Amino acid sequence: MSNKLKTFTNGIIKENPVLVLVLGTCPTIATSTSVLNALGMGLAATFVLLGSNIVISLLRNIIPNKVRIPCFIVVIAGFVSVVQLLLQAYVQSLYQSLGIFLPLIVVNCIILGRAEAYASKNKVLPSALDGVVMGLGFTFALVLMGFFRELLGAGTILSGYVNGVNGIAVPFFHSNPMVMMILPAGGFLMMGFILAAIQKIMARKED
């Protein structure tokens, strides 16, 4: 149990793929313009991580070493296709909002990295846990950035992309939006602020 708890805390906090390892910067910046956008991308990536880790772990003794990366990509692409079809069928607005970054999950360095570094070398249950934890860590980072970028850039929380969800307007920020925060430049700035804050907190804990 302690090992599972350690794996969970590592994926969410100590080894967060975005906030500590600084992986997946491109989709993080592009899809964290709002909370719901970020949540959708994070959950999609988590589903792909879980499914691909399980399948790759099951096939780890069958896949030839020389062609392992192409095989990993084929497996990951299968799960990404499932996600695309589901979103296109049931959450069309989110599907359109994520755009090209949804199919680009196939070559996301976080997912390929976990397939190569962990799933291909470990049993199914640990690989599944690793996929869930890393996916939740990615989702946490996206939602955190999405919250601040949406709040500062649009003055709302939980707006758009889901039918019946109109969002909550925060009066001061809604009247004085910092539009740059929902642009790519604002994404880089917000990511820098959050990374700096996390490094500061971690340095204090070490001291």
Question: Residue locations for each model-derived region?
Answer:
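C-terminal ends of transmembrane helices
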Residues: 51-65, 112-122, 197-199
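Hydrophobic core segments of alpha-helical transmembrane domains in multi-pass membrane transport
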Residues: 23-29, 45-46, 50, 77-84, ...
